[in-house]
Amino acid sequence: FIEDYTSTQASGYAFGYVNKIKLKEIYGDNVVIVTAHYGKDDPMPAKEYSEYIKEIGMRYFPNTDIDRTYRELYPYIGSYDGEYLIYSYVDDFDKAKEQMSVATVDVSGKLSEDNNTVDVEAKVKFEFSGEKNNYALFYVLTEDGMQDDSWVQENDMYEFDGYGLEEEEPLFEPFIKASEKMTGLVYDDVIVASQGAITGIEGSISPTINIDEIQTNKISFNLSDYPIIQDKKKLNAYA
């Protein structure tokens, strides 16, 4: 589970954009990526997630966390600190995947017939038994295809024009060949709503845990509470 933090004011936005494409190409359905926008001039921040970003003291954008365990990894580059621009984020992701998972979470979401509500159900199956009171679920809704002609994206990749970087990584080319301020971009995986992002939802996980026993939790999102949503048909639910 990757939380991708960005902003229309983040001049390194291209690194997060390209990183997401490459991760999806490599891992397919085995990776979940949600993108949290942040900043007073960004048109896409979700209120609760902005509060969460403040809570954790995020220092720069773009940025990522993996499973809320591997913190502040720069997208595309990851923890690599060498002098060359190398796609090494996969090394960090593979390291995170090697850690034994304590549970699996299956999530389903359904948009109501009147398009006003999304009902979400999470089924959690733990890999151990015991008494633990430190687990809780949080939920996010993301939207794909968000765009507006008035949105302006800061971009510093234009400074690499003439260095041949696009030959090494073709996905950077649209940004290298663009100007310092870009318009017409389409934003996917954007967090438009969340519940419990900061501390989890109290009571969503029973402290009495039995191996292979499925715990079920349900919540609803009233979409009128989230005005940044553009197209209710392009929403995805995660927990």
Please report, for each region that a protein language model flagged, where it lies by residue:
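Local sequence-structure signature of Cys/Sec-based thiol-disulfide redox active-site neighborhoods
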Residues: 1-36
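Short, conserved sequence motifs used for protein processing/export or organelle targeting and
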Residues: 32-239
